[in-house]
Amino acid sequence: MTTSIIERIDAWAEKTPDFPCYEYAGTRLSYKELKRQSDAFGSFLLNNLNTDKEKPIIVYGHMSPLMLIAFLGSIKSGRAYVPVDVSMPVERIEQIKKAADPSMFICTEELPSNLTITGCPVLSQEQLMDALEKHFDEVPDKAECVKNDDNYYIIYTSGSTGNPKGVQISQNNLVSFSNWILQDFSLRQGLRFLNQAPFSFDLSVMDLYPSLLSGGTLVPLDKTITANMKDLYREIPAQNFDVWVSTPSFADLCLLDENFNQENNPSLTRFLFCGEVLAKKTATELLDRFPDAVIYNTYGPTEATVAVTQVKVTRELIEAYPSLPLGVIKPDMRLHIVDQETGEILPEGEKGEIILIGASVSKGYLNEPEKTDQVFFDYKGYQAYHTGDSGIIKDGYLFFQGRLDFQIKLHGYRIELEDIENNLKKVSYIQNCAIIPKMKDEKVDMLVAQVIPTNHDFEKEYQLSAAIKNELKEFMPAYMIPRKWIYKTEFPLTMNGKIDRKALNSEVNK
């Protein structure tokens, strides 16, 4: 049982010093080097930062080993880290920087030329390397390290106002999650883990920390590989993965390659899925192609530390229900299905809101007390969270029944539809809009934008769409930009004058 994340990771530097903890783009980082360099960086921060430790450190980059060194160095200095990926638009990065009010902004990659960070110290990649060299062999005082209920990391998720919210995850939250994953999923020492998700997406926590805590090797597939199917299909068997952690959509992409099977990936014996609905079709095909593998379906919001339920997917389970269950709750958590209006706990078999209670639940949103109070609450002395997800319990299993609001999961990313709409309304060509998820195989396949445009001079609709997307890419992440565009002169309205989303949904999902 882990009680300290850092102590457990550092222990591998003694047990297996030369074993690779991270392999990326031809470089290998050993456990000994991870400890030495994160110690050096923690020492640098303690020597150079006099600000309140409540202020986190933003770590900007992609999948360089420097990201891990910066994460753990921040923790050793007593400060939480905020991962920010290079794929984020400048405006989003600026929003996160403003909301987080960090003590430092660390760059493991070069910043975009049109982004200027002010209001806090900025450490360039070159300065980071100099700091690691200057503080070589220095070891920070263990008493300074993040501990107990201190924030460990803060991940920013989509917010309904168009501004992201920072979910605070404590050392205790992460310890609870990690112990559960290592025990319930039987993750032994020395395994090779796939890292598909960028570190700014909390699915990455499901591979990053189980890998480091079990003395394994984390192997990321960065955006240059995942964006090119030929490269992706060539790289996967070459990496000899033991543990696969991804969204179901990423597995669907890989299943398009007929060579993605047990014969070509003999060591691949565990699939862990989170982030969106796992379709029965996907699970069945994986069982067919990987007869030696175990497949786990999991569920959980960022606010409850990645995942809180799990179930082993078997052919019997697939045949038993119309859709796959999300599983059973982890031992130190409780789950209730409640009536959204009255808050009354509902019996098994009745649909209502999923409420999560216990050790995995976040303390709330960073510097956002009002938003925190809207969804977090105390339940008999335990931290609890209104997920906004609709669920039902059958035979002891939790089943997902959709969102109670306008929030959806697309390719593992949690997205507020209002967030997209608010951003679309900034575009000069858009008068009004509504975002409708297009469903396929029990999950969101793509986003459809229904738009009432302003007056324009374009002859063809595709020209208008191109102009809109050109504006959007300046301030909205690519995964949030709708794939299909439908233009209207007016929207249907409900009796109380609101956009009739049910009618629009019926048009999209015929």
From Swiss-Prot:
GO biological processes: lipoteichoic acid biosynthetic process
Binding site for D-alanine: D202, V306, K498
InterPro entries: AA_adenyl_dom (IPR010071), AMP-bd_C (IPR025110), AMP-bd_C_sf (IPR045851), AMP-binding_CS (IPR020845), AMP-dep_synth/lig_dom (IPR000873), ANL_N_sf (IPR042099), DltA (IPR010072), DltA-like (IPR044507)
Subcellular location: Cytoplasm
Protein keywords: ATP-binding, Cytoplasm, Ligase, Nucleotide-binding
Pathway of action: Cell wall biogenesis; lipoteichoic acid biosynthesis
Annotated binding of ATP, by residue: T157, S158, N297, T298, Y299, G300, P301, T302, D389, K498
UniProt feature coiled coil, ranges: none
CDD domains: DltA
Pfam families, per the entry: AMP-binding, AMP-binding_C
UniProt superkingdom: Bacteria
Main localisation: cytoplasm
EC class (word): ligase
SUPFAM superfamilies given in the database record: Acetyl-CoA synthetase-like
Reactions that this protein is recorded to catalyse: holo-[D-alanyl-carrier protein] + D-alanine + ATP = D-alanyl-[D-alanyl-carrier protein] + AMP + diphosphate
A GO term, aspect molecular function: ATP binding
Its job: Catalyzes the first step in the D-alanylation of lipoteichoic acid (LTA), the activation of D-alanine and its transfer onto the D-alanyl carrier protein (Dcp) DltC. In an ATP-dependent two-step reaction, forms a high energy D-alanyl-AMP intermediate, followed by transfer of the D-alanyl residue as a thiol ester to the phosphopantheinyl prosthetic group of the Dcp. D-alanylation of LTA plays an important role in modulating the properties of the cell wall in Gram-positive bacteria, influencing the net charge of the cell wall.
Name under which the protein is recorded: D-alanine--D-alanyl carrier protein ligase
Gene source species: Listeria monocytogenes serotype 4a (strain HCC23)
Upper taxonomic lineage: Bacteria, Bacillati, Bacillota, Bacilli, Bacillales
